[in-house]
Regions:
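Flexible glycine/proline-enriched surface loops and loop-helix/loop-strand junctions
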Residues: 198-199, 238-241, 270-275, 406-414
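Long, contiguous, secondary-structure-rich segments that constitute the structural scaffold
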Residues: 416-466, 517-525, 530-612
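Active-site phosphate/pyrophosphate-binding segments
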Residues: 217, 228-328, 469
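Extended redox/cofactor-interaction regions of prokaryotic respiratory oxidoreductases
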Residues: 109-179, 183-186, 195, 211-215, ...
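Phosphate/diphosphate-binding loops
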Residues: 5, 11-15, 357, 363-367, ...
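Glycine/threonine-rich phosphate-binding loop and adjacent beta-strand/alpha-helix elements that clamp
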Residues: 151, 392-415, 426, 430
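N-terminal export/assembly segments and adjacent metallocofactor-ligating motifs
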Residues: 1-223, 250-251, 343, 429-431, ...
Length: 612
């Protein structure tokens, strides 16, 4: 028996008991206060993926057109990569190389150690703006921090609001915390998700109208002594009736929501990431936090967590030019980038405006190195593919951006063939580059010991239980509403006549793009019956969905849980398996806050495919 830790991009960061005596099997660690002995629905695919015959076992070298390969040895593949790195550095400098990485593997060594190598050669740096950064930046401007409350304190709340998050699918342990408390549960979400069905009250604003919803709540609260003086008289015009016309939420429900926020204190708000991927998404998060401040609930939000981990030690200090993640295609078009080194990410699946991204990589003949477990869409575009290790095949630590526990991940089996962990790959690359600095060759155990010592974690206890509690580092909340009024006044709802708003949330089966090749994803277009009737469409019709970014064909699913005026296509499906995914349609426009993603501000036309 050993302890594993889920390194996927998920709030829960579960502690796992793993056995490999009679075949690989996993179960939730019953001692862990959050995991509490059970794992999410997606966890069963971890074993299937690790043992899959589809896994890459030998490095691949491109031959001719992209997608054509021959197998080579790891030694040869790394020689090709190092030769290309040296050629580019000599020709135009390290900044012509861009590591493209994100949260496909969040384990601390796997995530940060490769940065030591890239910082050593002075590459460009990818700005992580795809997920939650807009909301995080907005919270920092208003409160001085994006670090919220300990989720275990949800048990102390009289009311819990899940705003723009579907924890029944994406934070199952947090959902159970809420459901086993005595709190009244509100869900704010345009879609009637499984979370909304399980809540006491579901508020369903049109996408992108969270700001007028909050302003109308403040309008109601102004009658009960809650003074929003920092934003002037804006709230006066946002009566529930006025806001109802914008949001689609009945005025009476807005009033009830406002009074519950007033009377059911203490309350907590779990601020989700999906709804802030709108053009004004960061401002929406900031407006919610402002409302909470006025009600004396400043710190009672869940958004992010920090624990004093020395990230500079883990990854070094980046000094290269910043390249935005969301509109990578346009960044590649205007910057001299000659190599993309991809790990912990599948950008030719997960980034918006896929048609342009693929076109520019092809047109500029950008050299691509991809380190992954499978021959996914990004790997199919690569010049060199290096097989990666699963998290059962290396030692690491996993922290959480939700709770206050760090977990050990112990190696339980060897990688297949020449598959290699992130740590070991970059040690070999450093050696082949001729580097001598100790930090480039530091071992996994040495790094683990240093991190644990810094956190005052007893190593023996960690290895005995699989996890340890660590201190949340939050700092003092410093309220600063400067400029908020002007920001709110700049808001106007987005509409496009004749178009539906496209939402691309996470589905029940996947984490990002992981698992579509193992289980298969939902690739239907989900539409409200009313919109289908207006467009003369029926369930099961083959439809064309199009906008200025692309055109795709799929089948329609009539779904009353979808908000009128919107269409849902779940993200993460593999274009190499289905011929397309939702990011062939999504906008790569960015927000004001941290150039954050705005994919949920995409609009599309939907038409029935006509028989020829």
């Amino acid at each position: 028996m050993a302890f594993s830790a889920c390194p996927k991009d998920c709030f829960d960061s579960c502690s796992i008991i793993t056995e490999n005596d009679k075949g690989l099997s996993i179960r939730g660690n019953p001692m862990h206060p959050i995991t509490s002995g059970f794992l999410c629905y997606k966890a069963k695919f971890f074993v299937d993926a690790a043992l899959s015959e589809k896994r890459l076992k030998k490095p691949l070298l491109r031959e001719g057109k992209r997608g054509n390969f021959r197998e080579v040895t790891l030694e040869y593949a790394l020689d090709v990569v190092v030769e290309k790195i040296k050629e580019i550095i000599n020709d135009c400098g390290g900044e012509c190389i861009l590591p493209v990485e994100y949260a496909g593997n969040r384990a601390l060594i796997s995530y940060y150690f490769p940065r030591r190598f890239f910082n050593r050669i002075g590459t460009s740096v990818l700005q992580h703006s795809l997920c939650d950064e807009a909301g995080s930046a907005a919270l920092r401007t208003l409160l001085g921090t994006s670090v919220g409350m300990d989720p275990e304190d949800l048990r102390k709340m009289r009311m819990i609001v899940f705003w723009g998050i579907n924890p029944a699918w994406t934070n199952v342990h947090g959902w159970r915390l809420a459901k086993t408390s005595n709190a009244k549960i509100y869900v704010v979400d345009p879609t009637r998700t499984d979370t909304a069905r399980g809540a006491d009250v579901h508020i369903d604003p049109r996408p992108g109208t969270d700001i007028p919803l909050v302003l109308s709540i403040l309008n109601v609260l102004s009658n009960y002594g809650i003074d929003s003086k920092e934003i002037g008289d804006i709230v006066l015009r946002y009566t529930p009736e006025y806001a109802s016309r914008i949001t689609g939420v009945d005025a009476s429900r807005i009033r009830d929501f406002a009074l519950d926020l007033l009377n059911e204190r203490p309350f907590a708000v779990h601020i989700g990431y999906g709804f802030q991927r709108n053009i004004k998404g960061g401002l929406a998060v900031k407006t919610i936090a402002y409302m909470m401040h006025l009600l004396g609930m400043d710190g009672n939000f869940i958004y992010d967590a920090k624990h004093g981990i020395d990230y500079v030690y883990l990854g070094g200090t980046a000094r290269g030019r910043i390249i935005n993640q969301v509109n990578l295609a346009r960044e590649l078009e205007r910057n001299d980038i000659r190599m993309l080194f991809v790990y912990n990410m599948n950008p030719l699946n997960s980034l918006p405006n896929q048609n342009l991204l693929r076109e520019i990589i092809e047109r500029k003949n950008i050299f691509m190195v991809v380190h992954d477990l499978f021959l996914n869409d990004t790997a199919l575009f690569a010049d060199v593919v290096i097989p990666a290790a699963s998290f059962f095949e290396f030692n690491d630590l996993v922290d959480s951006y939700y709770h206050d526990y760090i977990a050990i991940n112990q190696k339980v089996m060897d990688p297949p063939g020449e598959a290699i962990s992130n740590h070991d790959l970059f040690v070999l690359l450093s050696r082949k580059m001729g580097f001598r600095e100790h930090y480039l060759f530091e071992g996994e155990d040495e790094i683990i010991d240093k991190v644990l010592n810094d956190l005052n974690v007893n190593r023996d206890e960690l290895y005995r239980k699989g996890f340890a509690r660590i201190r949340r580092v939050r700092g003092e909340l410093i309220f600063n509403p400067e400029g908020l009024r002007e920001e709110i006044e700049s808001y106007s709802p987005m509409e496009r006549e004749g178009y539906l708003r496209l939402l691309s949330p996470t589905g029940i089966h996947g984490v990002g793009s992981q698992h579509d090749n193992i289980h298969g994803f939902d690739i239907f277009a989900h539409m409200n019956p009313s919109d289908a009737l207006n467009l003369n469409l029926n369930d099961g019709d083959r439809v064309v969905i199009k906008n200025e970014y692309g055109t795709v064909e799929t089948f329609l699913k009539i779904d009353p849980s979808v908000k009128i005026g919107t269409i849902i296509i779940y993200r993460g499906s593999w274009p190499s398996l289905h011929g397309w995914n939702v990011n062939y349609l999504t906008t790569d426009d960015v927000q004001e806050y941290s150039m954050g993603a705005a994919m949920n501000s995409t609009f599309v036309k939907v038409e029935k495919v006509r028989d020829v």
